[in-house]
Amino acid sequence: MTSTNDIRRSFLDYFGGAGHHIEPSAPLVPYNDPTLMFVNAGMVPFKNVFTGLEKRPYSTAASSQKCVRAGGKHNDLDNVGYTARHHTFFEMLGNFSFGDYFKEQAIHHAWTLITQTWGLAPEKLTATVYHTDDEAFDLWKKIAGLPDERIIRIPTSDNFWSMGDTGPCGPCSEIFYDHGDHVRGGPPGSPEEDGDRFVEIWNLVFMQYEQLPGGERVDLPRPSIDTGMGLERVAAVLQGVHDNYDTDTFKALIEASVELTGVRADEAHRASHRVIADHLRASSFLVADGVLPSNEGRGYVLRRIMRRAMRHAHLLGAKDPLMHRLLPSLTAEMGAAYPELIRAQPLIAETLEREEVKFRQTLDKGLRLLDEATADMGRGDTLVGDVAFKLYDTYGFPYDLTEDALRSKGISVDRAGFDAAMAQQKAAARAAWKGSGQKASEEIWFDLAETHGSTEFTGYTSTSGEATVIALVRDGQPVEEARAGDEVIVLTNQTPFYGESGGQMGDAGMIATLEGAKASVSDTGKPLGRLHTHQAKLEAGTLKVGDTVQLTVDAERRDRIRANHSATHLLHAALRNRLGGHVTQKGSLVAADRFRFDFSHPKALTAAEIADIEADVNAQIRGNEPVTTRLMTPDDAIAAGALALFGEKYGDEVRVLAMGKADDRNYSVELCGGTHVRALGDIALFKIVSESAVSSGVRRIEALTGEAARQWLNGRDEALKAAAAALKTSPDEVPARVAQLAEQLKKAERELADAKKALALGGSGGDGGAAAGPAVEQVGDVAFLAQVVDGLDPKELRGTVDGLKKQVGSGVAMLVAVNDGRASVAVGVTDDKTGHHSAVDLVKAAVVALGGQGGGGRPDMAQGGGPNGGAANDAVAAVKAALA
């Protein structure tokens, strides 16, 4: 049997031997593409190459690309586990030609690989072509020798591909494998095509046209090839099975699930084991690529996938978290091909376990609610959207999990009602994924880059220099000149100004000409990653395209940014050393006055951890080692141990920053295009000022360096001295004195609370005299005792009412506590009276009088409150009225 790993390797070896560049899989989160939530096809990383916005140093390529289809237009989540070929995570094998070879060679490569390298019988193969693509029809006859009846013309859009309403497009040709007439189904294009007999294994897209806005198609000057083949599908064919879940990778994962749950993958439980196997792959790869579970965007899709698998683990009777215990089986199957799985294994395991523990806390309650809501329903009925939304909002059930849970009962869910409830609760504040990246409308940058090429950056070695103005942009349009008072974007052929990227803010400074033009630069951008755009305001003179200018960076501001940026590298290394290799940078902001650093870690840092990390960084600063820079290829840099940041896109040559010493190695080695100090002593001082949560599994540190850190510490010192003076003690004694005062205050508050409680119960006052307690009165057929007290802690209400109940003996006791204008109320009913009067009903009457809503508890004791403390006596009257 040919393993899935062997198939992947042989595909890449074949095309590598045919002169193709072998492109590693891109992360699942698309780089700078606001139109996609996840990479969902092999061509996605090459999209800008196909559209001409990006140039690569090769014209042919092949890859095995990780893909996820579980959100947006391409969403296979609902079908996973119940069909033979649907997955949330899959691998797409593909070969690509960017204006190099076209149809004939694409068909030749496909036929040679599947029939000669993989040995599929030609008589088992059928091809489809777009109904007007005579060229492809003839090529299949010529190259493969297929008879006319096994080259099927398809007139539908299934065999015509387009990137969108406009842009590259072209006909497709698909290759199908025939499992034989013992399997149900007919050939493509027939009424029985949805059966399992004929399985599509490869799609060849011939990009030969450009779709224009008016609907016209014109020939592309350099037609291209985009092919895609699902690895799981072709593995099933080559391994002689009809079901992707019977292939070696899935069999290993399902066997592990069976072993850990003790439940066989029989007809009743097969879907659950398949869901778990598929969703384990998707969840693990998403976490490895930097996505963590949350309640919005990509993180919410991940949470939906995880929780769907976790419900199926619950169906299998798993008493303890299961998913993280299956992870070793996944890394054994796929870790060699995707080493990021092994690198991120601790983080993946912790994330899976934490999410499953969290979900299990509400899963049983939610399922009970679902059972109650559907107890009287039958097949064909619909669960109302309000209940589905309550399951989502209260118990963490994504909508599709509720759908999945009701699938076996044949009950559907009211999607419109669910959406209406969601909209009503969250309204405009609902967090919808909006993507990120360059605005598609900013075509001007593409035009300028094509005309002038990339801006040469000279700022690594200098903060000033001469340049030529190559473009001026005002209000989004190119202009030839700018005058005093104009706000304009200035582009030059070269610049020492750093353009904002990699979390580092852009430089500020001045632009001047010998003729007297003078412009202040407030910021520098870097659109497309190639241009440097100076955001400037002309203060004097006239600036024209073609002028020679002197560019001067604000050096003092740049130095502070350098220090903060180098400190982020030291902090990153310290975090990984202290907390573990699962720590990865999730984002940063490097400004002149401060910096923040976001990183993956499942819990808050302790005070001791923060102190240790701070000490580690400052020790490196005191060591004052020089910062070294080398230019390397990305592969060489990573092989040498450099950290590459998730989501960053690197060119053919990268800067590798090494700084500090740890035993016989550098303390930190990272790929980075930013500006840095020359020696670590230039940072001077490092101080963490806050540590907080950004989202589930992501923490944020905010820190200061140099003079900003010194001023912050001085401010704390002054505050400490002021506190010491107010406390009439020395600064060293402030903590002990504050603790002493806090204990005294706590004691005084306890004594005051006891006094108020005693007063409410009619106990003795502070002067030793007897205080008149509340009088018991007869209301209707029940004894009733009520008291209104100012300042009694609401937490004391129930205990105090228990005391009042004893005074009543048999009847109802009520206490209203007024604090800061609000009122809290508790009502107690003695056991012999709960059959006639419920404390819950009585307290609800009181709460309405106080301007509140709700209130609850038990028949013998209930509590509530309202905003109108002035209506305390009205609340007493309301309870009396309810008793009368």
Swiss-Prot record:
Keywords carried by this UniProt record: Aminoacyl-tRNA synthetase, ATP-binding, Cytoplasm, Ligase, Metal-binding, Nucleotide-binding, Protein biosynthesis, RNA-binding, tRNA-binding, Zinc
GO annotation, cellular component aspect: cytosol
Gene Ontology terms describing biological process: alanyl-tRNA aminoacylation; negative regulation of DNA-templated transcription
Domain of life: Bacteria
Broad class of the protein's primary localization: cytoplasm
Binding positions for Zn(2+) per the UniProt entry: H565, H569, C672, H676
Listed HAMAP family: Ala_tRNA_synth_B
Domain topic, free-text comment: Consists of three domains; the N-terminal catalytic domain, the editing domain and the C-terminal C-Ala domain. The editing domain removes incorrectly charged amino acids, while the C-Ala domain, along with tRNA(Ala), serves as a bridge to cooperatively bring together the editing and aminoacylation centers thus stimulating deacylation of misacylated tRNAs.
Entry protein name: Alanine--tRNA ligase
Organism: Sphingopyxis alaskensis (strain DSM 13593 / LMG 18877 / RB2256) (Sphingomonas alaskensis)
